[in-house]
Amino acid sequence: MHYDTMNFLLFFIVYGFLGFISETVFRSLADRKLYISRGFLTNGFCPLYGICGILIIEIFILCELTIHNSLHALIAATLGSIGAVTLLEYIAGRILDRVFHCKLWDYSQYPFNLHSYICPEFSLLWGILSLLLVNFVHPVMEVLLYAIPYNIRVTAIIMVLSILFVNASYNMRKILYGEGHSLRKV
């Protein structure tokens, strides 16, 4: 399947929102208390999940197109997704820690973690999530989202990205100029 820029943006928005909801539910259940959002944005969206969703889909498409044995393609895509998403998680964690002096996640209590930004346990979880995304979630999302007329999709994308941009700009200004907003730590 070939996706144009608008479809990539649409999936970025949907998976950023679904990732935020999934993490909120997971943290609430794991901590046995109502989870309060951590992060840079304050509007129920996590860009890392949106980027990772697109990256995973593209890795699976690339492997399906280039590796003719379907089992080998599946294994390569899953391992590629684990590697790519883990690398992205490490880079994002490192940048957020260095730039904003705040860790938004901390795997220091997990064995074999690297600088507490990544660990094998969560990397394997990314592999499982990539299989669920590609085999169950994404096919349903394609059907649901493509049922919406194109001009409405474009309008929605522009509106949501505008809100995200304003939110990010506002929070960046508050952090950089010390006006009270701070990232919520783990």
Regions found by a protein language model. Name each.
Residues 1-186:
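Aromatic-rich, lipid-facing transmembrane alpha helices and their immediate juxtamembrane interface loops
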